[in-house]
């Protein structure tokens, strides 16, 4: 059984007398910065000139500097920028300010795993990745709880990188819930696979195909939306709370029987083979290469696909129906 680590396993005092620079102040950035600040740490924020987040960070009681200035002042640098922007910002603003003894950290391993960022040997390189969105990380911390997190060490120059990563995880509230040790390779590959094969790519296409099948068979689009998209959350919430078994305990016998006899007709050995191909593209760097090239061209394919998908009938129907649900407003 994989070992989990909690508050008593991590020493927050290791962060004393260290200035922590949070680079970026979006969903994760604001949560990391404020949780660390409330844990008694010296936190500053690094943003590009003219960032819309600057006024928010200042109103939250944080000192804001340019990315370069923040990295120069900091002992610990946490990069919380979108994957496609990290390399350029690192080369121009962060790398010139790295000195022996500093800690470079990430919340996702993409740029390290695929060699886009290559830190010098004299810094620690670690990862602390909460398994939840930033607003949840902040909310849970404020309520005396925490969001589980992953932590990893890629490079241990100081000899204390593992303990430091665990201390940071404690500072943002992760050890209240439990933290799990991994490595950059494992975190990156599993995260990308989950997004592509199940959570985003797989689920989106499953929902659309189900909707299309019903509409093409003559059923009302509104009913197709309810059955194939709206109710997804009801089932997923049950799965998250108690696993597949509890979900099946909570649905009707008719639904459970249909689950067993029809699910495998859709998700079968051929589907799994395709999943394995997706995983291979992630492992051998094909996906990363294609994504980087797409971003270098200013995302023409992604923009085209985004526009096409936004025009799908399910989006039009959903926009109308969501106004019926007061809790979604």
Swiss-Prot record:
Binding site for NADP(+): 25-28, 51, 53, 83-86, 134
GO CC aspect terms: cytosol
Entry EC no(s): 1.1.1.86
Ribosomal protein found in the keyword field: no
Names of the cofactor(s): Mg(2+)
Cofactor binding mode and count: Binds 2 magnesium ions per subunit.
Pfam families named in the record: KARI_C, KARI_N
Pathway noted in the entry: Amino-acid biosynthesis; L-isoleucine biosynthesis; L-isoleucine from 2-oxobutanoate: step 2/4; Amino-acid biosynthesis; L-valine biosynthesis; L-valine from pyruvate: step 2/4
Record GO biological process: isoleucine biosynthetic process; L-valine biosynthetic process
Keyword terms of this UniProt record: Amino-acid biosynthesis, Branched-chain amino acid biosynthesis, Magnesium, Metal-binding, NADP, Oxidoreductase
Record keyword Zinc present: no
Binding positions (Mg(2+) 2): 191, 227, 231
Enzyme class, spelled out: oxidoreductase
Domain KARI N-terminal Rossmann: 2-182
Function as written in the Swiss-Prot or TrEMBL entry: Involved in the biosynthesis of branched-chain amino acids (BCAA). Catalyzes an alkyl-migration followed by a ketol-acid reduction of (S)-2-acetolactate (S2AL) to yield (R)-2,3-dihydroxy-isovalerate. In the isomerase reaction, S2AL is rearranged via a Mg-dependent methyl migration to produce 3-hydroxy-3-methyl-2-ketobutyrate (HMKB). In the reductase reaction, this 2-ketoacid undergoes a metal-dependent reduction by NADPH to yield (R)-2,3-dihydroxy-isovalerate.
Family: Belongs to the ketol-acid reductoisomerase family.
Name of this protein: Ketol-acid reductoisomerase (NADP(+))
Species this protein is from: Prochlorococcus marinus (strain MIT 9301)
Gene: ilvC
């Amino acid at each position: 059984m994989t070992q989990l680590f909690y508050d008593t396993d991590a020493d927050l005092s290791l962060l004393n007398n260290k200035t922590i620079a949070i680079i970026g102040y979006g969903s994760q950035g604001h949560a990391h910065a404020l949780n660390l600040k409330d844990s008694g740490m010296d936190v500053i924020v690094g943003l590009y000139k003219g960032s819309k987040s600057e006024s928010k960070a200042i109103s939250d009681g944080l000192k804001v500097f340019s990315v370069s200035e923040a990295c120069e002042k900091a002992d610990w640098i946490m990069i919380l920028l979108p994957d496609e922007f990290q390399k350029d910002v690192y080369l121009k603003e962060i790398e010139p300010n790295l000195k022996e003894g500093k800690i470079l950290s990430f919340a996702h391993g993409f740029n390290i795993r695929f060699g886009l960022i290559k830190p010098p040997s004299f810094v620690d390189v670690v990862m602390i990745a909460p398994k939840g969105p930033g607003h949840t990380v902040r909310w849970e911390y404020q309520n005396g709880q925490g969001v589980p997190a992953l932590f990893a060490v890629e490079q241990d120059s100081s000899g204390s990188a593992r303990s430091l990563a665990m201390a940071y995880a404690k500072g943002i509230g992760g050890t209240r819930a439990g933290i799990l040790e991994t490595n950059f390779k494992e975190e990156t590959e599993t995260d990308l696979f989950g997004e592509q094969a199940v959570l985003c790519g797989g689920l989106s296409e499953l929902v659309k195909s189900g909707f299309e099948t019903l509409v093409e068979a003559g059923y009302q689009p509104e009913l197709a939306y309810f059955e194939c998209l709206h109710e997804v959350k009801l089932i997923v919430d049950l799965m998250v709370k108690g696993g597949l078994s509890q979900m099946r305990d909570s649905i009707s016998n008719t639904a459970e029987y249909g689950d067993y006899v029809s699910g495998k007709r859709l998700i079968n050995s051929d589907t799994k083979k395709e999943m394995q191909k997706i995983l291979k593209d992630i492992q051998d760097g094909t996906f990363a290469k294609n994504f980087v090239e797409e971003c270098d061209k200013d995302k023409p394919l992604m923009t085209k696909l985004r526009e096409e998908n936004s025009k799908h009938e399910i989006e039009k129907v959903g926009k109308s129906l969501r106004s019926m649900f007061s809790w979604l407003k």
